[in-house]
Design a protein with these regions (language model features):
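Acidic/polar, low-complexity intrinsically disordered N-terminal segments immediately downstream
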Residues: 12-174
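C-terminal motif of bacterial Sec signal peptides marking the signal peptidase cleavage site
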Residues: 6-10
């Protein structure tokens, strides 16, 4: 799409790279992604927002831009969500038009005509940009080369949002903690702390050392040996809040665990959390009912 004069430029000379791009490409246009962030949560469509800062490049430093269309797609179907006009862009630090786009999960599924029963965790909502120029040309993800989607331009024109299932309240079910210790001498004080409606329980691999007797006494029943095993937690119907937290004891680098979830009737088995390099703090589970 863009023609460049052959030149050697250091990867660290970002300003020179920008100057070269602006001065030497002869044709075409791109949308450069400056930054992007956001998640789509099945349980919170209104507050699940994808945002990105984008920058438009053309031979007239933005003068050729007619508009930028934002499409959303799901399972092969696509709908136009929004059209950005040049007036919605401001001049960025490189002298080129920049703007911030936001696409909420709620707006995406509304534009696509989807109900919650038609999508679930692991499904993908696609967001696609189309740059239209005043000379009649258009550029999008279906007509850009690999050199444009990576490197300096970071111009994919498309973003895939995987739907996550992050609970906003307690999810009734059976939680199985599959725990392991690489050294084979228990977790020595490390544990998973779970609080449900203000009641706290602790899960871990008991240590074989007498000095850890008091810490072992805090743990819920465990089935296994010093190298690994399981423990279970049942969260009943009607529970309001739940939180999962990792607290480190001695040698936490030896510890790893997964949390498997099933509904109270044993159906819907799935991995809600997996951590092989443990880190202290609250853990966010993904549970798709």
């Amino acid at each position: 799409l863009l023609s460049f004069i052959t030149v050697f430029i250091s990867c660290t000379e970002s300003d020179n790279t920008i100057d070269f791009v602006l001065e030497n490409y002869e044709q075409g246009a791109v949308i450069r992604t400056i930054s992007s962030e956001g998640d789509y949560n099945y349980y919170d469509t209104a507050n699940s927002i994808f945002s990105a800062t984008i920058e438009e490049h053309d031979t007239e430093s933005g003068g050729l831009m007619q508009n930028v269309e934002i499409y959303v797609g799901f399972n092969g179907n696509e709908s136009l969500l929004q059209t950005l006009q040049p007036g919605e862009f401001t001049t960025g630090p490189t002298g080129l038009p920049r703007t911030n786009i936001k696409v909420s999960f709620a707006d995406a599924v509304s534009a696509l005509g989807l109900s919650p029963s038609q999508y679930t965790g692991g499904d993908v909502i696609g967001i696609r940009l189309k740059l239209n120029l005043t000379d009649g040309r258009s550029f999008s993800s279906d007509n850009v080369t690999g050199s444009m989607t990576g490197s300096y331009f970071a111009s994919p024109y498309a973003y895939n949002m995987v739907i996550k299932c992050i609970p906003l309240s307690a999810v009734p079910g059976i939680y199985t903690f599959n725990m392991s210790d690489s050294y084979g001498d228990g977790w020595q004080g490390s544990h998973i702390k779970v609080t449900v409606d203000g009641t706290t329980t602790y899960y871990g691999i008991p240590s074989p050392y007498e000095s850890d007797a008091d810490r072992n006494a805090l743990l819920e029943p465990f089935s296994g040996n010093d190298s690994g095993g399981t423990a279970k937690l049942t969260i009943p119907e009607g529970a309001s809040t739940m939180s999962f937290e990792w607290n480190s004891g001695d040698y936490p680098s030896e510890c790893a665990y997964t949390i498997e979830y099933t509904k109270l009737d044993g159906t819907g088995q799935q991995t809600a959390f997996n951590e092989s390099s443990v880190a202290a703090g609250t853990k966010v589970l993904s549970i798709c009912e």
